[in-house]
A protein has these predicted regions:
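Juxtamembrane "stalk/linker" segments
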Residues: 1-45
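Membrane-proximal structural modules of membrane-associated proteins and complexes
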Residues: 36, 40, 50-164
Length: 165
């Protein structure tokens, strides 16, 4: 379909150039190379101290599960504490409430932003017996807000390729 579109636009170098530029902008957006803005949701999570005085921490696994749910609900861009999540992002829990995302130390409270259809994003997390329900039952404070003006920063590192030539 794209090839046919290029051929049809071939008559005008300006139109072809504009089409290629638009494709490049979209590709950079999906790769996380540009700041993005749009409607979506913000999720706030934080560690808590239980009745026995033990700190209960949000783990990397918790964050990964939420990111996976958001992706499955059609999130077009996601960040955690202003760290853009891309296909090469690592979310690693090292203990004592310390999580590394994109090799940056991130501490609780966590703010997860997702751009996409607010209804889908919110409903996948809030469904009866959903992951947010489970976190709340344990005692975690979880807040989800809808917004028409979510901003997610670009991925700050170079996208490195070891094997692609």
């Amino acid at each position: 379909a794209k090839l046919q579109e290029y051929k049809e636009k071939e008559e005008s170098d300006t139109e072809t150039s504009q089409l290629v530029q638009k494709e490049l902008e979209q590709t950079n957006m999906y790769l996380g190379k540009t700041d993005v803005f749009g409607e979506g949701i913000t999720i706030k999570l934080k560690d808590f101290t239980d009745e026995e005085g033990n700190i209960q921490s949000i783990t990397a696994e918790d964050l990964l599960v939420i990111v996976d749910y958001l992706k499955s609900a059609g999130a077009e861009a996601i960040s955690i504490n202003e760290q853009r999540i891309v296909n090469t992002s690592e979310i690693v829990y090292v203990g004592n409430s310390i999580v590394y995302i994109n090799q940056q130390r991130i501490l609780s409270p966590y703010t997860i932003k997702a751009i996409g259809n607010q209804t889908y994003l919110e409903s996948i997390l809030l469904g009866n017996g959903g992951y947010v329900d489970e976190l709340k039952k344990i005692g975690f404070d979880v807040d989800i807000e809808r917004s028409n003006k979510i901003s997610i920063p670009k991925y700050q590192k170079e996208l490195a390729h070891k094997y692609i030539q």
